[in-house]
Every structure is written in structure tokens, then in C-alpha cells.
Amino acid sequence: MNKQAIDALLQKINDSAINEGNPRTKQIVNRIVRDLFYTIEDLDVQPDEFWTALNYLGDAGRSGELGLLAAGLGFEHFLDLRMDEAEAKAGVEGGTPRTIEGPLYVAGAPVSDGHARLDDGTDPGQTLVMRGRVFGEDGKPLANALVEVWHANHLGNYSYFDKSQPAFNLRRSIRTDAEGKYSFRSVVPVGYSVPPQGQTQLLLDQLGRHGHRPAHIHFFVSAPGFRKLTTQINIDGDPYLWDDFAFATRDGLVPAVRQAEVRKANRTAWTVSSR
């Protein structure tokens, strides 16, 4: 079919609407369908390829991996770059860079003031201590900002999704003090991979790509009257630090990490400072 015939078919489909519907939804869906029709024609996509793709998306949805696919195909990073561009055009600059949320946030984590311990004490990973501070765009510290933190355990698994972990393990919300400061104790997370037999890895194999993520810690930072920040920090030295399958590593999000002796416990702790 030529594009004129395709456009005529699309118009027939659009004309079948029995009421106005939602204009924005119609605009988006019609554009996506048009581009897919063009793709099928241009690449001579066969019926078995089309139905294989459709069934694949159904399987990915049932297994809860659509969020991983969105990250792995670069959609989340693309959305971040678009927001960066919009802010730059509006004259907004500076501050901690944003990066992807990922699909593993869980609302309702316990709230602490100033400091929190994220782990339940059973994880054998190395101790991690992080201290940070939240500032407004004017450079003044923000008191009572909410810092939500979550990360994987020493096996690369997240509580709630990993039923062997207690509820909200390695997940906390911390309110900053009068000087905008917060801190937490946890364990050093490790990098992990998408499920090796899952739908995401199945597609990545077809694309000749890996599904590894470097060790990282997720953050939401919010305060009344300010834009909510969604970001992560990465643990320096991870072999996939700059080869993240989700494209989340960004300059400014790899803080210095150093080892420090914890004398009372006779242990070594990793400390992170984030201004």
C-alpha cells in the first residue's frame, strides 16, 4: 500500500468514532497508529511478526516488565532529556541532575526526622553511611524537605518485590533538619540484571544488548513550592557505571565514596557525602 491508501484507511478508522472522545488521547493514538502502519508497510512486517510482537507485549505486561522495557529502550532517559531541555529554555539551570525513577518505587515508607536506618540489620552487605543537604534554587537550605530513599540489597533485590525481605526494607523517607541536612545508614547496594529468563532480556538478546544496571540508590526529593526531583546516585567503581542498560548514569550523580573505620563495631563502612 502507498501512504495515500494508508491515510485513507486511517481516516476511515477515525471517522468511525461515535462521539468526540478525548481530543488529546485521539491525537496521540492516531499518531502512533499512523506511524505503526507506515512502519509495517516500509519494513514489510509480516503477520506472524506482528502477532509475535503483540503477544510479547502481553507477556511483558503480565510479568510486570513493561517498566523495565521502558527503561531499557531509552524511553525514561528520553523523557528526562526533554524535561532538561524545557527547563533550559525557561532559564532554569543548576542543581542536582534528574534521572530515571525505574519501576521499583513503593509508596508509604516509614518517615524519620533528620536520620534513618534503611536496613533491618540482617543484610551481610558492607555498611553505608550517606550525608546530604537539600538547597533551594537561591542556595538556601530547605528545612522539612522530604527525601525518599530506596535501593536493592546485597543480592540486587528490592523489598516488596522480593517477598523474603521485610516490608519497606531499604526504603525510608527522611525529613531534613533546620539546615537542610539528612543522613542515613544502610548497606552498600550491588548492581543487578533484568530477569535472565524474562521478557526484557528476551528482547535485549535480539538487540545484541546486555541487561545490567550498576549499583545505585534512588531518591525523590520534594518540598512545598518546589519541583519534585527524581534522581539516583551511582556507586563509583562499578563495572557497568557508564554502561547502564537503562542509560541512567549522568555526570554529577557519581559522588565520592570513601572507606572509613567504624571503631565501635570493628567494621569498615563506606561513606558518601552529597552537598
Swiss-Prot record:
Pfam families: Dioxygenase_C, Dioxygenase_N. Binds 1 Fe(3+) ion per subunit. PROSITE patterns: INTRADIOL_DIOXYGENAS. Gene3D superfamilies: Aromatic compound dioxygenase. One of its GO terms (molecular function) is catechol 1,2-dioxygenase activity. GO terms for biological process: beta-ketoadipate pathway; catechol-containing compound catabolic process. Its EC number is 1.13.11.1. Induction: By aniline. Its cofactor is Fe(3+). SUPFAM superfamilies: Aromatic compound dioxygenase (SSF49482). Pathway: Aromatic compound metabolism; beta-ketoadipate pathway; 5-oxo-4,5-dihydro-2-furylacetate from catechol: step 1/3. Keywords: Aromatic hydrocarbons catabolism, Dioxygenase, Iron, Metal-binding, Oxidoreductase. Can cleave 4-methyl-, 4-chloro-, and 3-methoxycatechol at lower rates than catechol, but has no activity with 4-nitrocatechol or protocatechuic acid. Belongs to the intradiol ring-cleavage dioxygenase family. This is Catechol 1,2-dioxygenase 2.
